[in-house]
Structure formats: C-alpha cells, structure tokens
Design a protein with these regions (language model features):
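A generic alpha-helix structural signal
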Residues: 25-28, 66, 70
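Generic hydrophobic, aliphatic-rich segments that mediate packing or membrane embedding
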Residues: 61, 65, 78-80, 92
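Short loop/turn motifs at secondary-structure junctions and domain boundaries
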Residues: 71-77
Length: 192
C-alpha cells in the first residue's frame, strides 16, 4: 500500500522554534557531518549542544526580522526561512535569501535530513517555495549556488528544471563559510 506524506512549509519564527526545538536539535545532530560541509552553523563549534543550537536559531530569527524591517524602510533585500515539516516532524529547511523586490529574484537554499532523502521531500518543498515566490512575492526567477561535489542538490535542482547559469572557481561557500570550493549557479524562471 502506498503511504502518502504530508509536506508543509512553515515560516521559521519563535513559536515554531519553541514547539519543535528538540526535533530541530535531533535532526541537526543526526545530520551534522553531512551538513557542516555546506552550512557553517552545523559545525560542532557553532552549535555544540541543545541550548547553543537553540540560541543560534533564535539569533537567526531575530536577524531575519531585522532584515524584514529594513526591507520595509529601505526596499532592500531580505530573507524568508521555512521549516520543512513531514507528517508534523522536522524534515529539514528551505528558504529564500537575498529576496530582491527590484530584480524580482531570490536565492533558494534547502537541506533535508538523511532519513528524508529519496522520498521527494526536497522536490515537493521546492515546488511549494516556487509557488510562494511567484504568488506571494511576485518573483520571476530563483537561483541556487551549489558546491560542485554536492551531487544530490545538483540532481534535485536539475529534476526541478533549474539550469546551470554559471560556474565560479575557487570561491568561499558563503560569506559565513570561508571554505574555498567551486560553486555551480543554477537558475529557473518561474511562471504561472
């Protein structure tokens, strides 16, 4: 019998963090080795235990709120992080960074726990965030920068009709993660 999954995207906020804090930490800790190559916050030095992980997540929520206030004042870029929930449990995260009301695009990022790989959780989440981007934010395209060795993410983006736009050599993964690598930039024009 085919079992159906309920995949939801919930905006990351204080109440969600409070309700699912232990679930967040469990998923992060179980996937730390895989995630720390791509996300600086997954490193044991940044989030070594439950309380420091939750404090980091609270700081992230505050930073997101600050960027949204700044956006309203100065029409500047902002972020929108979401928690991927599968059957009411944390399955990963997906979000939009550098949402630009001027160029009508944003950078998409995502990760799912190892136990949720191969179940189309990332694919369904990408479709949901594309719908949100188009219908709620009036964006016209999304792009993703992927470490060249991250075969899963490249495959997921390709299956979702993202195409390679650029390759950058010998660059840091992000401004917060100085690890030098090669990045592949994917882009998708989103339409109704």
């Amino acid at each position: 019998m085919l079992q159906t999954m309920k995949i939801e995207l919930k905006k990351l906020d204080f109440s969600l963090l409070w309700r699912h804090s232990h679930d967040f930490y469990r998923v992060l800790d179980a996937n730390r080795t895989r995630l720390q190559s791509y996300f600086f916050w997954a490193n044991k030095k940044v989030t070594p235990n439950f309380s420091k992980t939750i404090l980091f997540m609270i700081a992230y929520v505050v930073d997101t709120y600050y960027k949204n206030i700044k956006r309203k004042i100065a029409n500047s870029a902002y972020d929108a992080p979401f928690v991927i929930m599968r059957d009411n449990s944390v399955a990963g995260m997906i979000g939009l960074d550098n949402i630009s009301p001027i160029s009508h695009d944003a950078e998409i990022w995502f990760w799912v726990s190892q136990e949720n790989e191969g179940l189309c959780v990332a694919t369904q989440s990408i479709k949901k965030i594309e719908d949100y981007s188009l219908n709620q934010l009036n964006l016209q395209s999304l792009y993703a920068s992927v470490v060249y060795t991250n075969e899963r993410s490249k495959s997921i983006l390709t299956r979702n009709n993202y195409t390679i736009e650029d390759i950058k050599y010998n660059v840091p993964i992000s401004r917060r993660n100085p690890t030098i690598t090669n990045l592949i930039k994917f882009r998708k024009i989103i339409t109704k």
